């Protein structure tokens, strides 16, 4: 197996810098669109053969160092007993969670019974790849999932979830606790199915002040990370707009902290220290730069991150209009310049 990513997550030496891309299996790939044109998104997530097929597509086309299982962070939420509608315009909960009664109605599902198709997709992905690269399992963080559930979908202001947290903190903690009780076995199921590393996405964590994040989110993330690390796999935590939260993310005990593009890698390293690996952090829209400029951005990030304990990635998901050839150019540039970085020959 190409184990660069796993070695980097553990801050062990690698021959070059490993790279994968958030949302690397997605609408920017014509082969993905060919499959997606015949099946609804949620149905695709629940079809192990097709989910495995689209998981493998970017590994084949781009040469990335890992496959992240094709799924959605809201899959385990649906298994808790709430109606979920997923389409190209984003998620929608027609019956949002707003009261104690709503929270009490939510179950803590058996992961195999409620989401076993995710485990099966991981097994089929490993077989299709012949274990050539590791498979990344993932889940959303309790706050991000709760934000969707309470708001009823995406939000720009997060008024409803924040009001719940600030006006009825005991209810918010009850919801976060129930989500954590669901997510830990869900991720352990993915590890048992063959995921070699897992990522926890707190996509909307940057909506909270560091003070509120420490109070409402860190206790649950610490518990998740601790229980997952006990399985022996490395754990990545990532959120958008969280440059001022890095020390908090480090406190979770995660092996890797993902950075978005708003903070240079070397500055993130200073906050995190030498005992945590980093992931990131190219702006997804830099894939629209001319190739020479994109190449320069790759070099700069590699130089700032250093040769060990760095997984190259975007600062958030790859965007649908992205040219797949630009993504392939990026992967090849990371690998090429990663070697030069280790040889001391990385130019300007």
Curated annotation (Swiss-Prot):
Residues noted as binding substrate in the record, renumbered to the chain: 23-27, 72, 148, 203, 316
A single cellular component GO annotation: cytosol
Chain ranges passing through the membrane: none
Location in the cell: Cytoplasm
Record-level GO BP terms: protoporphyrinogen IX biosynthetic process
Coiled coil start-end: none
Keywords assigned by UniProt, alphabetized: Cytoplasm, Decarboxylase, Lyase, Porphyrin biosynthesis
Documented EC number(s): 4.1.1.37
Site, as annotated: Transition state stabilizer: 72
Catalysis: reaction(s): uroporphyrinogen III + 4 H(+) = coproporphyrinogen III + 4 CO2
Biological pathway: Porphyrin-containing compound metabolism; protoporphyrin-IX biosynthesis; coproporphyrinogen-III from 5-aminolevulinate: step 4/4
GO molecular function annotation: uroporphyrinogen decarboxylase activity
Subunit annotation: Homodimer.
Record function comment: Catalyzes the decarboxylation of four acetate groups of uroporphyrinogen-III to yield coproporphyrinogen-III.
Family: Belongs to the uroporphyrinogen decarboxylase family.
HAMAP family with a match to the protein in the record: URO_D (MF_00218)
PANTHER family named in the record: METHYLTETRAHYDROFOLATE:HOMOCYSTEINE METHYLTRANSFERASE RELATED, UROPORPHYRINOGEN DECARBOXYLASE
Protein name in the entry: Uroporphyrinogen decarboxylase
Organism: Myxococcus xanthus (strain DK1622)
């Amino acid at each position: 197996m190409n184990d660069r990513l796993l070695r980097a997550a553990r801050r062990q030496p690698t021959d070059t810098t490993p790279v994968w891309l958030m949302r690397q299996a997605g609408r920017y790939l014509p082969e993905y669109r060919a499959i997606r044109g015949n099946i609804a998104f949620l149905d695709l997530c629940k079809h192990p053969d097709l989910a495995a097929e689209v998981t493998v597509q970017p590994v084949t086309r781009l040469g990335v160092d890992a496959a992240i299982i094709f799924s959605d962070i809201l899959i385990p939420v649906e298994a808790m007993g709430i109606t979920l509608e997923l389409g190209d315009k984003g998620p929608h909960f027609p019956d949002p969670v707003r009261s104690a009664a709503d929270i009490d109605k939510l179950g803590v599902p058996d992961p195999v019974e409620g989401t076993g198709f995710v485990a099966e997709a991981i097994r089929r992905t490993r077989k299709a790849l012949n274990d050539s690269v590791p498979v990344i399992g993932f889940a959303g963080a309790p706050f991000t999932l709760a934000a969707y559930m309470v708001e009823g979908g995406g939000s720009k202001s997060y008024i409803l979830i924040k009001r719940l947290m600030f006006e009825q903190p005991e209810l918010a903690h009850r919801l976060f606790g129930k989500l954590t009780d669901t997510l830990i076995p869900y991720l352990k199921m993915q590890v048992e199915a063959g995921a070699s590393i897992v990522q926890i996405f707190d996509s909307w964590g940057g909506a909270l002040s560091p003070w509120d994040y420490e109070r409402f989110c860190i206790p649950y993330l610490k518990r998740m990370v601790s229980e997952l690390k006990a399985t022996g796999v490395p754990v990545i935590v990532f959120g958008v707009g969280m440059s001022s939260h890095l020390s908090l993310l480090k406190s979770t005990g995660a092996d890797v902290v993902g950075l978005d593009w708003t903070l240079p890698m070397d500055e993130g390293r200073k906050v995190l220290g030498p005992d945590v690996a980093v992931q990131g952090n190219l702006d997804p829209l830099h894939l629209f730069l001319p190739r020479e400029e994109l190449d320069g951005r790759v070099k700069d990030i590699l130089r700032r991150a250093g040769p060990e304990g760095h997984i190259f990635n975007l600062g958030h998901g790859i965007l649908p209009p992205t040219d797949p050839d630009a993504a392939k150019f990026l992967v090849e540039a990371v690998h090429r310049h990663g070697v030069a970085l280790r040889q001391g020959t990385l130019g300007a």
